[in-house]
Swiss-Prot record:
Family statement: Belongs to the class-II aminoacyl-tRNA synthetase family. ProS type 1 subfamily.
GO CC terms in record: cytosol
Subunit-structure text: Homodimer.
Protein name: Proline--tRNA ligase
Taxon lineage: Bacteria, Pseudomonadati, Pseudomonadota, Betaproteobacteria, Burkholderiales
Subcellular location: Cytoplasm
SUPFAM superfamilies: Class II aaRS ABD-related (SSF52954), Class II aaRS and biotin synthetases (SSF55681), YbaK/ProRS associated domain (SSF55826)
Pfam families found in the cross-reference section: HGTP_anticodon (PF03129), tRNA-synt_2b (PF00587), tRNA_edit (PF04073)
PANTHER family assigned to the protein according to its UniProt record, in alphabetical order: MITOCHONDRIAL RIBOSOME PROTEIN L39/PROLYL-TRNA LIGASE FAMILY MEMBER, PROLINE--TRNA LIGASE
């Protein structure tokens, strides 16, 4: 491609709303243009990157035995009602009506449609296993779309769905997709981790996320540098930090703590380590009849509640945080001084594993401006009703696999695989005849990749102050040839054109900038766009018999003989 025939429209400044590097740089590089909140036009450079990502995804999905189809964006509400997700999904599901006032949705995902296809198309075990996939537009009505393509409302995803005759087969399909995802992200040239994850609203019993490592990532990834253990912080198991409970060494005492409503303030006031304090978190679970059940969750003062773990405990499904009225009713005190000793009304008490082994701890006294010091289980209050893992792990916690300590880094989720089992096939009655001629329910898996999100994630991981630094596999162009003096020197033009044609003949995706721009402007624009390799052809260099090669990641250019320019360019590309 020649730049004079292409649409390039870079900007010096990013829009004020662009908070992160990928949003800023994609806008400045002319890759996207905002149409509405969370909705973007993919301009030629942006679309080129997307198509390259789709190509790699498609190749690996086909190689793994998946079969491509294309399901509609608009789906009838009846299928969502049948699965139960019409009521469950919430405001992110964009509901629409046609001219006949029939309900439809703009698809955020396609489990219902693919299961409907399966129940109509799969009759016999002889047709199994099957794995269908599509690459399609999705829409989720995010409350606050932000970060450009990272959290937009309209986006492109690859969804795959496997169907098997039994659980063992479904697990094999899961493993095949897991391996395919590893290959996809390796080919994309991204640093990533596959981590165990919660299944969330999709459901199922087994799940892994594929996270691109980036400091701006919204997710926290827990991993063990000494082993293969890795999990999303939502799922990472937090051990008890005390193996046994020490004997009481202090008497229980109510001490004044005026204005100290936080554990940090209490610890400072009493000159104690924060780890000696206990924080109280009050949850409520609404009941079909009568008042809500109230639960008191206890964590060490320096730990944070993991809401995913809490929601999985018996009796806490669908919990909410208690209202101030409910707190006053059960504790006789406002938040900030709550504790498990002498509550005004009975509550269910759940202690984190570490809290259950603490002795002589500090907790709220259920009296404003007072805390108890020297509190002990069994002596001053009953043993907790339940002991459970309630907290987020922290850096340095022992690894659950017993092999060293945990580290934490940030990541951007770009892929997710789920073992669904029969969650959707049972709800939609997707059955087949087994080898005994009897009806059996299909076992399912689903596997998603955020195609457009990968674009943003790749930039978050690969950029500097000058612009984007694309991995070669997904760069809009692999090489840009920058002739200095295009309009003045026939030798420069001929040399640049010859190299351009030679690279094209060898299948290299190359751009020739024939706009006769000033060198500084031309170089800055291509550094912003992030093409991996630049070849500079100038009259001064040609007089010395050389051209210059500069990889986007490198600070210095290398001079190579003109007659070796093609070979050296190809060799340099192979290193990128």
């Amino acid at each position: 491609m020649r730049a004079s025939k292409y649409h390039l429209n870079t900007l010096k400044e990013a829009p004020a709303e662009a908070e992160i590097a990928s949003h800023q740089l994609m806008t400045r590089a002319g890759m996207i243009r905002k149409l509405a909140g969370g909705i973007y036009t993919y301009m030629p450079l942006g679309l080129k990157v997307i198509r390259k990502i789709e190509g790699i995804v498609r190749e690996e999905m086909n190689a793994a035995g998946a079969i491509e189809l294309l399901m509609p964006v608009v789906q009838p509400a009846e299928l969502w009602m049948e699965s139960g997700r019409w009521e469950q999904y919430g405001a992110e599901l964009l509901r629409i009506k046609d001219r006949h006032q029939r309900d439809f949705v703009l698809q955020p995902t396609s489990e219902e449609v693919i299961t409907d296809i399966a129940r109509n198309e799969i009759q016999s075990y002889r047709q199994l296993p099957l794995n269908f996939y599509h690459i399609q537009t999705k829409f989720r009505d995010e409350r606050r779309p932000r970060f450009g393509l990272m959290r937009g409302r309209e986006f492109t995803m690859k969804d795959a769905y496997s169907f098997d005759r039994d659980e063992a087969g479904a697990q094999r399909s899961y493993d095949i997709m897991y391996a395919a995802y590893q290959r996809i992200f390796q080919r994309l040239g991204l640093e990533f981790r596959a981590v165990a994850a919660d299944t969330g609203s999709i459901g199922g019993s087994r799940s892994h996320e594929f996270q691109v490592i980036a400091d701006t990532g919204e997710d926290l990834i827990v991993y063990n540098p000494e082993s293969d253990y890795a999990a999303n912080i939502e799922l990472a198991e937090a051990p008890a930090l005390l193996a046994t409970r020490a004997a009481p060494g202090q008497d229980l005492e109510a001490v004044p703590t005026p204005g100290a409503a936080k554990c940090e303030d209490v610890a400072k006031l009493l000159d104690l380590p924060l780890a000696r304090t206990i924080k109280s978190i009050v949850l409520a679970v609404d009941q079909p009849e009568g008042p809500a059940q109230v639960w008191l969750l206890l964590l060490r003062g320096d730990h944070e509640l993991n809401e995913i773990k809490a929601g999985k405990l018996p009796g806490l499904a669908g919990f909410r945080f208690a209202t101030e009225t409910e707190i006053l009713d059960h504790f006789g005190c406002k938040p900030g001084y709550l504790g498990p000793i002498k509550t005004a009304r009975p509550v269910h008490v759940v202690a984190d594993r570490t809290v259950a082994n603490m002795a002589d701890f500090v907790c709220g006294a259920n009296r404003e401006d007072y805390h108890y010091q020297g509190a002990n289980w069994g002596r001053d209050l009953p043993e907790p009703e339940l002991v459970a893992d309630l907290r987020n792990v922290v850096e340095g916690d022992p690894s659950p696999d017993g092999k060293g300590a945990l580290s934490i880094q940030r990541g951007i989720e770009v892929g997710h695989v789920f073992f669904l089992g029969t969650k959707y096939s049972e709800a939609l009655k997707a059955t087949f005849l087994d080898d005994n001629g009897k009806p059996a329910v299909l076992q399912m898996g689903c596997y998603g990749i955020g195609v457009t999100r990968i674009v943003g994630a790749a930039i978050e991981q690969n950029h500097d102050a000058r612009g984007i630094i694309w991995p070669r596999a997904i760069a809009p162009y692999e090489v840009v040839i920058c002739p200095v003096g295009w309009g003045k020197s026939e030798t420069v033009r001929d040399t640049a054109l010859a190299l351009y044609e030679a690279l094209r003949a060898r299948g290299v995706d190359v751009m020739l900038d024939d706009r006769d721009s000033r060198p500084g402007v031309m170089f800055a624009e291509w550094e912003l766009i992030g093409v991996p390799l630049r070849v500079t052809v100038g009259e001064r260099g040609l007089n010395e018999g050389v051209v210059e090669l500069q990889a986007r990641r490198e600070a210095e250019a290398a001079k190579v003989p003109v007659d070796q320019a093609l070979a050296q360019t190809l060799a340099k590309l192979d290193l990128l």
